A protein has these predicted regions:
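Bacterial Sec-dependent N-terminal signal peptides
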Residues: 1-7
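Residue-level signature of the cytosolic catalytic core of signaling kinases
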Residues: 11, 18, 22, 34, ...
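Short, conserved catalytic-motif segment at the N-terminal edge
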Residues: 15-73, 106-109, 153-159
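Extracytoplasmic/secreted envelope proteins and their assembly/folding machinery
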Residues: 19, 23, 27, 82, ...
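Active-site SXXK
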Residues: 26, 40, 46, 70-99, ...
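Alpha-helix C-terminal capping/helix-coil junction sites
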Residues: 30, 89-90, 194
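Short, surface-exposed loop or secondary-structure junction motifs
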Residues: 58, 112-228
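Short, glycine/proline-biased beta-turn/loop segments that scaffold the active-site neighborhood
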Residues: 96-112, 201-202
Length: 228
């Protein structure tokens, strides 16, 4: 497929036809999977060549989803945490096989494995630390995530579920601890480090660690599958 330098890729007839086909497929999948809305962007050679929203960002007021709708990214946050850790490693501020307690003296978790090695940063990132999936706090029942203080205090009552490196077990708690290491090694809050060293350099102006009131009108409201 040949495209002249002065022609936008999205204006190419073949590309336009494929985009229309893609849009039809997306709409059919939304119906099949009961998806209320989504946004999609396509980047080619560092240029955004396609961006569009489908469906609704809020079912209650039938607000249309657009290319500017923002979403809670949940566990995709782990990508930012891992990136921050690797940046700090490259800066010589930590090593992946350093024990967690070298940076976080308060990191103490009960264990029934007396000869287990110390938990390392690498194990946090690879879900092989032996830590439970969640912090010892019932936020799944009251929709409230634990604060930093609550997470640290809760560690006193938690127990390793297996010895480090024994197996793989997905752990949100492990990445929360990794975020604390980012803050300690960088000498600044996690949110500040991510914003200065990842989001700003990439021009991710609509991505924030904490929700901003100015984003409220653009934020998609989640819903359970039976509500959609």
């Amino acid at each position: 497929m040949g495209i002249s330098q002065n022609q936008r890729i999205s204006d190419n007839p073949e590309v336009s036809a494929n985009l229309r086909l893609m849009e039809q497929w997306i709409q059919s999948q939304m119906t099949y999977r009961s998806l209320p809305g989504l946004s999609i962007g396509i980047v080619y050679d560092q240029e955004l060549v396609y961006a569009r929203g489908f469906g609704y960002s809020n079912l209650e007021d039938s607000a249309a989803t657009t290319s500017q709708t923002i979403y809670r990214i949940a566990s995709l946050t782990k990508v930012f945490t891992a990136t921050a850790i690797m940046q700090l490693r490259d800066q010589g501020k930590l090593r992946l096989d350093d024990p967690v307690e070298q940076y976080l003296p308060w990191f103490r978790v009960k264990s029934r494995f007396p000869d287990q090695p110390k938990v390392t940063i690498r194990q946090l990132l690879t879900h092989t630390s032996g830590l439970p999936r969640e912090a010892a706090y019932p936020y799944w029942t009251d929709n409230k995530f634990p604060s930093r203080t609550e997470m640290i205090k809760g560690l006193e009552n938690q127990e390793m579920i297996f010895a480090p490196e024994d197996r793989i077990k997905y752990s949100n708690l492990g990445f929360a601890v990794a975020g604390e290491i980012v803050a300690e090694a960088a000498g600044m809050p996690y949110s500040e480090y991510v914003e200065k060293n990842i989001l700003a350099p990439l021009g991710m102006k609509s991505t924030t660690v904490y929700f901003q009131d100015s984003q409220s009108k653009r934020l998609a409201e989640g819903c359970a599958i039976y509500e959609c």
